């Protein structure tokens, strides 16, 4: 469908599209992946996709309907001589896939950067018990450096590793955002 895109671009678009279905119950992930692979390359009728994949058309329709609910596929109703009923031809809207993914990644980056600037720039205290919350210096002082939940002494938490992990995640998100923006530019 998008001849100017390379295999790597198509893989990114497939992964981004499939990420929109991550939380969907009742959708077979393998059918979803293979269905997206088909409509990434061409417009297709659900029955043709099902036949090509060797699966029940209802499974393919489930995937297509969920993607349609998210606004990333469109369809058009048509009549074909070989079918006795109207059929629906499905097409992936790559620009919308990219727009939604960019929006989500930017939001994630904003959250990570907020955590880096706020949470990670101030000392945090914890008792060591997984069930108990972390506290800021001010909160720890209010409780006289004792955990209000279990009564243990609060110790300063070393945030070095968490900070490093958040910085790595922020860099990964920036790289992914740049890649998606370049892809969007090429699609026009």
From Swiss-Prot:
Region forming the signal peptide: none
Keyword DNA-binding: yes
Pfam families xrefs: TFIIE_alpha
Superkingdom, taxonomy of origin: Archaea
Entry protein name: Transcription factor E
Gene Ontology BP terms: regulation of DNA-templated transcription; transcription initiation at RNA polymerase II promoter
SUPFAM superfamilies (alphabetical): Winged helix' DNA-binding domain
Disulphide bridges, residue numbers: none
Transmembrane segments: none
Annotated family: Belongs to the TFE family.
Domain notes from UniProt: The winged helix domain is involved in binding to DNA in the preinitiation complex.
Domain HTH TFE/IIEalpha-type span(s) in chain numbering: 9-98
Entries under PROSITE patterns matching the protein: HTH_TFE_IIE (PS51344)
Task performed by this protein: Transcription factor that plays a role in the activation of archaeal genes transcribed by RNA polymerase. Facilitates transcription initiation by enhancing TATA-box recognition by TATA-box-binding protein (Tbp), and transcription factor B (Tfb) and RNA polymerase recruitment. Not absolutely required for transcription in vitro, but particularly important in cases where Tbp or Tfb function is not optimal. It dynamically alters the nucleic acid-binding properties of RNA polymerases by stabilizing the initiation complex and destabilizing elongation complexes.
Quaternary structure, from the entry: Monomer. Interaction with RNA polymerase subunits RpoF and RpoE is necessary for Tfe stimulatory transcription activity. Able to interact with Tbp and RNA polymerase in the absence of DNA promoter. Interacts both with the preinitiation and elongation complexes.
InterPro entries membership: TF_E_archaea (IPR016481), TFIIE/TFIIEa_HTH (IPR017919), TFIIE_asu (IPR002853), TFIIEa/SarR/Rpc3_HTH_dom (IPR024550), WH-like_DNA-bd_sf (IPR036388), WH_DNA-bd_sf (IPR036390)
Record's keyword terms, sorted: DNA-binding, Transcription, Transcription regulation
UniProt gene name: tfe
